[in-house]
Amino acid sequence: MKTRATSPKDNAEDQLAGCIEKFTPEMAKAIRAVRAALRKRLPAANELVYDNYNFFVIGYSSTLRPSNCFAQLVADAHGIRLAFYYGSRLPDPAGILLGSGKQNRFIRLASARDLSKPEVEALIRAAVAQGKVPLPATGRGTLVIRSISAKQRPRRVTAKPARRR
């Protein structure tokens, strides 16, 4: 039996697919659509993947350093968000950013189409512009699996058990 040599990129894509498959089929489809839209919008950005206890995250960065991520696709069993690590510094005239911490802000995404709204595009442009390291004008970013936690919250909403009386 022949085995096919896999490149690190193939392996990373396979691992990413495995992370996304933990979600319901509808949520997985939405995650893939948002990722494709962000990849089209930010082709030179590196994708840093974290499948942690609470959230599945793909950070978009001009380098391979997590601290240089300017935007993140964040998903859990309840929905998808676009987060900005330095979101408190972003101009938000439409008032769509949520969150009250010192730095992080996010928006909820109903679908990938939300990324094409002018106010969301403006936030992405501003986040890229305020990045510590400029995003390359050309080229294709790398997919890097940074962390997959062994213990995770369920990625699918489960029905609550009936209360005993």
Residue map of PLM features:
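Charge-dense, helix-prone N-terminal extensions
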Residues: M1-R165
